[in-house]
């Protein structure tokens, strides 16, 4: 049996052009969702699954990501002086959430290259990859289940979701075989954004992966 999975990789080097003009001066991962930035939900998801060692793959103009998970002593002092305990605890929560590490993707060569930048950090351990473009309801406990499947089958695990067959041209679509488990299929192929008439299924890849180290 391999080592327990403890590391998460979060690629966050993209330019966020789909969200312009909102992302002209702000990383898309820092866009607020209710009361905190989107990236914090992703890190919290990793931590809730037991992954406290988080490597973020960043790029130019992404300093706000590191700053968000760092101390802000001036703000802390001001909140403490005001007696604003609630907000003080909220910003301290993000600071102590995980053991955060950062590596830059120097050239924008896509997702595979970004994940490859994690090689020295993850070493010979299996690891999770979480994409910030997809926010998962924590009540689904998706990542926990994926880790369980990985540990049972000793294989890499990719999250899939059922999409409307007319929308397959927007996703990577999997060719699958059924297994004895109702929530597990065996992926035999992947097709990137197929025309609906050519799609092998309506099961789309979403941004959660549990990968064995040999993929690097």
What are the language-model segments listed below?
Residues 2-80, 108, 141-145:
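N-terminal glycine-rich phosphate-binding loop and ensuing alpha1 helix
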Residues 4, 50-51, 123, 152, ...:
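Short loop/turn motifs at secondary-structure junctions
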Residues 22-23, 168-169, 201-202:
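Short glycine/proline-enriched turns and hinge-like loops at secondary-structure junctions
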Residues 29, 99-101, 186:
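Conserved beta-strand segments of alpha/beta enzyme cores
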Residues 32, 102-104, 158, 189-192:
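Structural signal for conserved beta-strand scaffold positions within catalytic alpha/beta enzyme cores
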Residues 38-41, 113-117, 189:
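Well-ordered alpha-helical segments embedded in enzymatic catalytic cores
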Residues 74-78, 85-178, 211-213:
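Conserved beta-loop-beta/alpha segment of the NTase-like Rossmann-fold superfamily
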Residues 128, 147-151, 179-216:
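Catalytic-core segments of class I nucleotidyltransferases/pyrophosphorylases
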